[in-house]
Amino acid sequence: MTSTFHTVGAAAAMVVLGIAWTVYVSVLADERGMLRAAAPEEGFLPLVQLSLAVLGVLTITSEHATGMIRTSLVVVPRRSTLFLAKTGIVALATFATATSILLLTYVTSRLIAGERQLGFNESAFTDDLPALLASGLSVTALALVGLGLGAAMRSTAGALVSVVSLLFVLPGAVNYLPAPWNTRIATLLLPNLIPQIASERMSSRLGDGFLPPWAALAVLFAYPLVTLTIGYYALKRKDA
């Protein structure tokens, strides 16, 4: 329970950081007249992704560490039912939490920005909504990936290292590949699926991705599907 408060609290820190960032760039804009700054809901998204991915990992690894998994299996003997229930709870909780945090960050930053030209506040909410929903889905996908890896590895440290590698290490390493392989591989990496779902450029360096929105969404769903399948069979075959 304590870890849940900590992880959700860390994710919610995005709102505070978003307010601080918007105030900072607003002051700069008042001095310079105009400024193009990164949107806080995009810049601080990795904080939410990592925090709630930790929650997904701990949902299963904490029970293995404390032995509570045996109690859970006594209450719910069917491992498929137990794992499906955990998957559903993590999915609903993380999507609701992430979407709420993203929307609150979005609204507060635009209210603070006012009429200032900061770059990120020049588009309408309806234009930004696909990216916000895609960001929320990415958080849920990472949390479910964490759950699947945690079930497969039964190690908090191992699962977290894998999540961090997927979220930060691999995207960073791909940037150093020669073109066009950097863009081709980056197109399939989880963090780069968000702009493709929203029909946006991945980055100025990588350019446009190769996936249409529906295909990017399918790849995003494939990440948790694969890891959850592996985690389920690991839970089913190994002794608690």
What is the role of each PLM region?
Residues M1-F5, P77-R79, R154-T156:
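Short loop-to-helix capping motifs
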Residues M68, L103, L144, L160-V161:
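Transmembrane alpha-helix boundary/hinge residues in polytopic small-molecule transporters
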Residues V219-A240:
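Junction motif at the cytosolic side of a transmembrane helix
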